[in-house]
């Protein structure tokens, strides 16, 4: 559990794709949001009940099945709004009466504790992160020493390049990165560690980044991801 001045966070490891979902709550009011409800919710619901937490919101980083496949189940239990970037809402096409479409840099409140949505397209058109205090829930935009795929429907490596640049330029180096999947040797990192060890931060040329993301990366790296110092430090493929 990560704790800061006004907000507490509990991480749950769920599903066959190593998802990490996050329960965030205001320490004073116990108002909570669940980020990317998917797979097995029983441990989450038990934790909420046992700690007298009041779940009031669902926050989505994007609309891929492995991040939303328990939204309907949760809404049967809790009549609460679902927050998603407005571009992603259109891309997804799912209709909820209580769907709230977010602009980038729009604030969300749990009690008096503030979270901010950050539009980070690339993995999907409306992918977003959620920042609060010194933390960034990064969904499938940024993994520890990796980034989200851009070869699925709606993916765009040019947009991913811009999104990573925006994170690098607009967040403090000690920001804690909380990814949507546990694909690395570490569960979390700081932005400073990502800038120094994530190969996707080492590009200043868009064309080279696109080539690496779309063609070279999956041939030269394997999970769990470890830090790489410079683009040259990648595994050479073995040929028969």
Which residues does each PLM region occupy?
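Short active-site segment of divalent metal-dependent hydrolases/proteases
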Residues: 65, 69, 126, 143-144, ...
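Accessory terminal helices/loops
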Residues: 1-4, 162-235, 240
